[in-house]
Amino acid sequence: MKGTRAIGSVPERSPAGVDLSLTGLPPPVSRRPGSAATTKPIVRSVSVVTGSEQKRKVLEATGPGGSQAINNLRRSNSTTQVSQPRSGSPRPTEPTDFLMLFEGSPSGKKRPASLSTAPSEKGATWNVLDDQPRGFTLPSNARSSSALDSPAGPRRKECTVALAPNFTANNRSNKGAVGNCVTTMVHNRYTPSERAPPLKSSNQTAPSLNNIIKAATCEGSESSGFGKLPKNVSSATHSARNNTGGSTGLPRRKEVTEEEAERFIHQVNQATVTIQRWYRHQVQRRGAGAARLEHLLQAKREEQRQRSGEGTLLDLHQQKEAARRKAREEKARQARRAAIQELQQKRALRAQKASTAERGPPENPRETRVPGMRQPAQELSPTPGGTAHQALKANNTGGGLPAAGPGDRCLPTSDSSPEPQQPPEDRTQDVLAQDAAGDNLEMMAPSRGSAKSRGPLEELLHTLQLLEKEPDVLPRPRTHHRGRYAWASEVTTEDDASSLTADNLEKFGKLSAFPEPPEDGTLLSEAKLQSIMSFLDEMEKSGQDQLDSQQEGWVPEAGPGPLELGSEVSTSVMRLKLEVEEKKQAMLLLQRALAQQRDLTARRVKETEKALSRQLQRQREHYEATIQRHLAFIDQLIEDKKVLSEKCEAVVAELKQEDQRCTERVAQAQAQHELEIKKLKELMSATEKARREKWISEKTKKIKEVTVRGLEPEIQKLIARHKQEVRRLKSLHEAELLQSDERASQRCLRQAEELREQLEREKEALGQQERERARQRFQQHLEQEQWALQQQRQRLYSEVAEERERLGQQAARQRAELEELRQQLEESSSALTRALRAEFEKGREEQERRHQMELNTLKQQLELERQAWEAGRTRKEEAWLLNREQELREEIRKGRDKEIELVIHRLEADMALAKEESEKAAESRIKRLRDKYEAELSELEQSERKLQERCSELKGQLGEAEGENLRLQGLVRQKERALEDAQAVNEQLSSERSNLAQVIRQEFEDRLAASEEETRQAKAELATLQARQQLELEEVHRRVKTALARKEEAVSSLRTQHEAAVKRADHLEELLEQHRRPTPSTK
């Protein structure tokens, strides 16, 4: 179906009209299918400013005729209206749609604005591989007449568009690395020598990217039920290019039918929707698993951060970021200088060529043209590589350049979050690349108003734009997942939405091996510079080809007339004026873009500062809570220490009181004993005095009698000597008694003092030792905990860094195969977490209950033992006092016995001479004295026995007190061991809890290894199958060769037989002819 339509307008919007905006969430950059849209090698990050100059030239080349491919694409999502081709006069004042601007809301509702508006001469930007979509406003004069005449009436048309974001080389995420890998792979797989002009058929596709998209579509069809994608996006590109070529005026160019194009576009949209839905489901599952794992490891992370300083991690991260930023800026500066020099050289060459081309038409009449004439269609069709490259350049242009004019009515209303902040060097780089691409695109067709169809670049951009829109069947709100280290990589804060891109396909493991991506710090990579240079070269070649084709296709006339020369001069003047105007507009656009980028930079800096301040506040709160918890623990330890010291002091006070009571009782017993001894001494002295006086009186009587008998002098001598002896014995006895009493009292006091001092020293030494040991244990435990936490924090930081790096490397290859394993891991980890939590709670409650019971029992036992000890102490003191009294009595008795025996011996010796006279009286008196003394001795022996018993009791009490002290010390040591065991159990539980992450990580690595082993086995099986298939193909080839050889032999044999038969027939004919000829004899 052929036809033309006005370029400057699109179908009017009706309730059932065409609305190509696939409503829904605008997919992020790295998930969009723009990277797989062309067959040309994909360049990682190439920016193009689709300025007004190239669009005006394309319009002048395409003329009023609309492209059939654009009609087909615009009818792809409409069910009630099909745009019919229409013809009209060319309207050069109305700009064409270079990018089909469409609007999508996160809620999935239908937008009130039409899709028909497009950027005008102010220029438009379009980004493919960025993280965030950018919106820009369009001037009011950029709208076509049909869009302004829409039946929406006074309803305001919103022109803010969420364009595909820009993927520059400063994107340091894994998506950038995957994009580089895909770029390098496609560069290596598709060299420029393999490129060929596209076929006219719409089924022509690029084999590798088609396989990639089919692989992703097959995986998506498992959950959605859609069929296999029959055609590739590149086929849509070829179809658009072929349709463009067919509508430019060449006679009888073959085109695809409308139904086929609609069916193909519908299938592409369905496949895109399926893949997006499937990937979104997978992203949700991964996010849920990551959240559960994060919740599981959150407690451990808090323990890891509790002893670190408030700003240690943040300062380290800022230092690393500053160093990385410096290196990146230096590299960017060098690369920009090189790119600026090359672009300046290219521009100088282009300006020189343009000046020679402008001076050329008066000399070559074939290059002159009448302003109203149409040019052939070859002027608009550059090389296929150039077309594909232009599409890629347009896809990668920065989306931050607004196309606002004086009459702007459209304000940016993008709901998505602003794009990641770029430094000024990156913005300068993007603007430089866009300016270069805009200058390169100026070498397109020289005129804009004389062609019949739109260029293939616009159709490619429109097709990619339709494919990159989010489908309206899954309006899902965004969910931002911020991990612990999300502030460390603010560039990659955009959530992972789903789309059909080479990045996703590479992450799902559908791409084969490809080289390593460039390092993250490169701002202007070699691939980008090479792509810019190759694009400039191709554009120069295409411009030269266009000039050649103009020279070849132009019919020479008899000679240029003055009218033609004047028209050409006026045309060149108008073109130069238009170029000057467009340059001015481009300069205004760039100035606005620079201002917007500055505002955006300031806003992003403020947001980053706010996020960092919030995170710093969270960390400060966390550290303060940790410090408060530790201070509370230290206060609890201090309180426990105070309680123990108070208990110890109470025990010491009780011991002191007992000692004081004991000393008081000893003093009382000694005083009583002294009183009793004094009474006994007084009684003994009185009785002895009475006895002595009586004895003296009797002796005096006897002496008188003896004196009477003549013995008086001798008796007087004996009496005098006896008195002296008695006085001497009395003095000795009194001195010995005093000495013995003094020695006994001194010895008792000395022993009591020694015991008291020894007890005090032992108490002080034990208290000091206990305090020192407790302090050393606490200090050692505190140092060990700090060291262990520091080591564990460092180890976990290194492990987290290594784990992130390793997982980032492995996730690109294994994510599609590991979804089941991750779900199982999440279930097992959640079950294990619940079991461990329940077990830990149970153990903690049991430990607390057991500890409380043990404390209660220990308190009761301590109270009972204290009471028993007090009772035993009193008994021992009484026994000791009795023993001491007995000992004193025994000593007194022994001294007294000695004194009595001495007195008896002296008296017997003294009375030896008077024995005969006083024997009877002396014997009777001795008997009386012996009886009396024996009674007193028996009493003293009884008192001595009592004192001995009391002393033994006191000794037993002292031994019991020492045993009690030893037992209490043993109990203290036992409690310390129990406390150490509890601490060991606590440390073991803490280590088990810390090792939980390691166990989960080990299990995950084991499963990864198993999945890798399965992958290797599958690859080996695939290799065997391929080898078997190759062998079978070789066998078939061999059989075909043998069959062909046999056929050739049969044909050759038949040919020889045929030749022999022909020879035989010729021979027979000759013979027959000879027989027919009459013989000469017959004549």
From Swiss-Prot:
Where are stretches of biased composition, namely Basic and acidic residues? 317-333, 360-369, 1047-1076
Q: What's in the misc comment field? A: Transient cell cultured-based knock-down (by RNAi) of CEP131 leads to a reduction in ciliogenesis. However, analysis of mice with chronic absence of CEP131 following genetic deletion (knockout) shows that cilia develop and function normally in vivo. This suggests that CEP131 is not essential for ciliogenesis, except for the modified cilia of the developing sperm flagella, and that there is an alternative mechanism to compensate for the lack of CEP131.
Q: Which residues carry this modification: Phosphoserine?
A: S14, S35, S47, S78, S89, S105, S114, S146, S150, S381, S453, S499, S731, S798
What functional role does this protein have?
A: Component of centriolar satellites contributing to the building of a complex and dynamic network required to regulate cilia/flagellum formation. In proliferating cells, MIB1-mediated ubiquitination induces its sequestration within centriolar satellites, precluding untimely cilia formation initiation. In contrast, during normal and ultraviolet or heat shock cellular stress-induced ciliogenesis, its non-ubiquitinated form is rapidly displaced from centriolar satellites and recruited to centrosome/basal bodies in a microtubule- and p38 MAPK-dependent manner.
Result of altering S78A = Partially reduces in vitro phosphorylation by MAPKAPK2 and decreases binding to 14-3-3. Abolishes in vitro phosphorylation by MAPKAPK2, interaction with 14-3-3 and stress-induced centriolar satellite remodeling
Instruction: Describe what upregulates or represses it.
Output: Up-regulated by the transcription factor SP1.
Annotated localization? Cytoplasm, Cytoskeleton, Microtubule organizing center, Centrosome; Cytoplasm, Cytoskeleton, Microtubule organizing center, Centrosome, Centriolar satellite; Cytoplasm, Cytoskeleton, Microtubule organizing center, Centrosome, Centriole; Cytoplasm, Cytoskeleton, Cilium basal body
Q: What is the effect of changing S78D?
A: Phosphomimetic mutant. No effect on its localization to centriole and centriolar satellite or on its function in ciliogenesis. Can rescue centriolar satellite dispersion defect mediated by deletion of CEP131
Q: Would you identify the family this protein belongs to, as annotated?
A: Belongs to the CEP131 family.
What is the predominant subcellular site recorded for this chain? Answer: cytoplasm
**Could you tell me which residues belong to the region Disordered?**
1-155, 220-258, 301-429, 1047-1083
Compositional bias annotation for Polar residues: 68-87, 138-148, 232-245
Q: Which GO terms describe its biological process?
A: cilium assembly; intraciliary transport involved in cilium assembly; intramanchette transport; manchette assembly; non-motile cilium assembly; positive regulation of cell population proliferation; positive regulation of intracellular protein transport; protein localization to centrosome
Supply the gene name.
CEP131
- How would you summarize the oligomeric state and partners of this protein? Self-associates. Associates with the centriolar satellite BBSome protein complex. Interacts with BBS4; the interaction limits BBS4 availability for association with the BBSome complex, and hence negatively regulates ciliary localization of the BBSome complex. Interacts with MIB1. Interacts with PCM1; the interaction increases in response to ultraviolet light (UV) radiation. Associates with microtubules; association with microtubules is reduced in response to cellular stress, such as UV stimulation, in a process that requires p38 MAP kinase signaling.
Interaction with PLK4: annotated span: 1-250
Q: Does the keyword Ubl conjugation apply?
A: yes
Which effect does the record note for changing S47A?
Partially reduces in vitro phosphorylation by MAPKAPK2 and decreases binding to 14-3-3. Abolishes in vitro phosphorylation by MAPKAPK2, interaction with 14-3-3 and stress-induced centriolar satellite remodeling
Q: Give the domain of life.
A: Eukaryota
Q: Which residues form the IQ domain?
A: 269-289
Q: What is this protein called?
A: Centrosomal protein of 131 kDa
Q: How is it modified after translation?
A: Ubiquitinated. Undergoes monoubiquitination catalyzed by the E3 ubiquitin-protein ligase MIB1 in proliferating cells, preventing cilia formation. Monoubiquitination by MIB1 is inhibited in response to cellular stress, such as ultraviolet light (UV) radiation or heat shock, resulting in cilia formation initiation.
Q: What positions are modified (Phosphothreonine)?
A: T383
The question of whether Cytoplasm is a record keyword is answered with yes
